[in-house]
Amino acid sequence: MMQKQNMIVVNQTEIAKNIYELVLQGDLVQQMNEPGQFVHIKVAEGITPLLRRPISICNVDQEKNEFTMLYRAEGQGTKTLAKRKQGELVDVLGPLGHGFPVEEAEAGQTALLVGGGIGVPPLYELSQRLVAKGVRVIHILGFQTKDVVFYEEKFAELGDTYVATVDGTHGTKGFVTDVIDNYGIDFDILYSCGPLAMLRALEGRYKEKKAYISLEERMGCGIGACFACVCHLQEDPSGHSYKKVCSDGPVFPIGEVVL
C-alpha cells in the first residue's frame, strides 16, 4: 500500500564515483514486499526542484524498519539529495509500481539477473528473495568503467557474479552480452534492469525465454496520473495501446512493450 512519510536518514555514503548509498528509516518500510518497486523522493523543502525523483529500492530490512537505495548524483535534484545528513528527514512516497515476479522462479532453477549502471540496485533485493526460496542466481553487472562499479562483493555473496565494463578497466571488456557469450551462461529465467540499449539486446536474444525487464523512464507524478511515462505495446502496431511505466510497470514481461 502506497504511503507518504517523512523518513529519517540513517546514513549516506558515496560508494563509487557519484554513486550514493542512502539508508532511510520509517514505518513505510513495512509496505515494501515486492522487489523492483521504487519510491518517489522529494529532494528539497522548497519548490525547486519541483518534481519528485524516482529511485529504486535496493534493500529492505523490515526488522529495523530501514531500506536502502542507490542513486547517481548527476542533476540538480540528486545532487541536492546527496547533501542529506544523518538524522535529517526525507519526504518519501511509496512503494510504487509493480516489481519483479519472484514467484515465476522455482526452487532448483537458475535465474540470470542482468543489470546495467544504475539499473543494478533493484536486482540486489530480488536476488536475496530468490536465494531465500532456493533459486540459484547468476549476476551480470555492466558499468562504463571501474570507478563506477558498486556492490560486486555483495552480489558475489549470493551467487556467481560477473562484471563487464565498456572500457575494460574491470572484469570483461564490453557489454553484458559479451559475458553471456564468453562464459556460455545458461538459465531458466531472466530478470533485468538497465538502459534501453541493453534491454533491446537481451530482448533480441531471449524473446522466447521466460524473462522480465524493468524500464528506466523519466516520471512526473509516479502514480499514473500525468501520462509522462507511457510506453506502447508491441501487440498493437497502430501505437494506440500503451501502458504507464510508473503504475503498470516498471517491470514488464519481455516482448510486451516497445523498447
UniProtKB/Swiss-Prot annotation:
Cofactor: [2Fe-2S] cluster; FAD
Key words, A-Z: 2Fe-2S, Electron transport, FAD, Flavoprotein, Iron, Iron-sulfur, Metal-binding, Pyrimidine biosynthesis, Transport
Family: Belongs to the PyrK family.
GO molecular function: 2 iron, 2 sulfur cluster binding; electron transfer activity; flavin adenine dinucleotide binding; metal ion binding; oxidoreductase activity
Cofactor detail note: Binds 1 [2Fe-2S] cluster per subunit.
Metabolic or biological pathway, per its Swiss-Prot or TrEMBL entry: Pyrimidine metabolism; UMP biosynthesis via de novo pathway; orotate from (S)-dihydroorotate (NAD(+) route): step 1/1
InterPro entries with a match to the protein in the record: Cbr1-like_FAD-bd_dom, Cyt_c3_hydrogenase_gsu, Dihydroorotate_DH_ele_sf, Dihydroorotate_DH_Fe-S-bd, Dihydroorotate_DHASE_ETsu, FAD-bd_FR_type, FNR_nucleotide-bd, OxRdtase_FAD/NAD-bd
Residue numbers binding FAD: R53, P54, I55, S56, L70, Y71, R72, G77, T78
CDD domains: DHOD_e_trans
Listed name of the protein: Dihydroorotate dehydrogenase B (NAD(+)), electron transfer subunit
